[in-house]
Every structure is written in C-alpha cells, then in structure tokens.
Amino acid sequence: AAEYFQTVLTCSEIGAGKDEPEIYLQAAQALGCKPEETLVFEDAFHAACTAREAGFPVIGVYDESNRRFIHQMQEQCICYCDQMEECIEFLNANGIYRE
C-alpha cells in the first residue's frame, strides 16, 4: 500500500467503523489536507457513502463481495475501477497523479 498511499489507517486503530466518518477525517488530518482535497479509495458501498457525505471525493474499487452495488458505487464515486491500474489512469488523465 505504501507504493500508492501516503497514509494508511485501519478502523481498529481509529476505534470506529466505516459507517462513521472518523477514519476519513483522521486520515485527512494526518495528511494535512481538507476532506475535499483527500481522495478516498473504497470497495464498500456503505463506506463510499460515508466518505462522500463527509465531503471526500471517492474512487470506487471493484470487490467481488460488493458486486451487487456496482451501479450505486458508480453513482456515488467520481470514478469506479475494476483494477488499480484503471484508477491510476483516471488520476493521470485528470492531472491528480503523475507516475
């Protein structure tokens, strides 16, 4: 994960699940960024909704266990990807990330 992300936090470290925005808010704080400046990568629909409602742009990542929520994820997220390479292509195309 360190190859792609500056900070990685877990729900157990924070003491709250992804149905609460605390993990996302603490991640933004750790990065020294505002929510609207912090990309959230999520594979769970409920978590994507939580992050979006807290003001974060969300990139949806496919996960087999959440397949039934693909259309909802596509509506909630600024981008929805089957693989990390697709996410990187989206970020490059939008000037958000450069390899």
Regions found by a protein language model. Give the residues of each.
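Asp-based, Mg2+/Mn2+-dependent phosphohydrolase catalytic module
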Residues: 1-99
